[in-house]
Amino acid sequence: LIKEYRLIGFDNRRDAVADSTIDLEGGELGSGNSVLAYFEIVPGSDQLFKDTGPSGEKLATIDLRYSLCNDTAHLRFSWDCPANFTDFKSIDKELQFATAVAMFGLKVKQSKYIRNAEWIDIHNIAQASYDPNVFLQAEFLQLVDKAEAIYSRKKKKKSKSDD
């Protein structure tokens, strides 16, 4: 089902992510908090995203190793990701907003993995999904606009110097 995959944000640990036998060290996560991991996948065929219903096939298996606070014993949790697809506009607004944040990080880094996305795409996703009651989300929208102005100026200066 999957031809290639990449854990976004772990470009410096690409070999470790590619080897499914290696445990990746993570940071500490306090009680009541959560973490979100983004994987970019290259499907083995276009059919993967056309079938939106449950198929019985699994897309991936996520293995999580963790320990409880003040405990040295490691516990494991394994979860099979079903091979079903949900249109982006149908997922939770929080996940849509988190996607805009991830795209922003890739764009600022000038990652080769986000060359087809423009600042307006990031802004539109964030604008459509942010909660106006959450100050940090509103501030993020301003940050996207500021970054666009700065990075667009850099691009224009570079273009003029290339002439």
Regions found by a protein language model. Give the residues of each.
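Acidic, polar loop-rich interaction surfaces within structured domains
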Residues: L1-C69
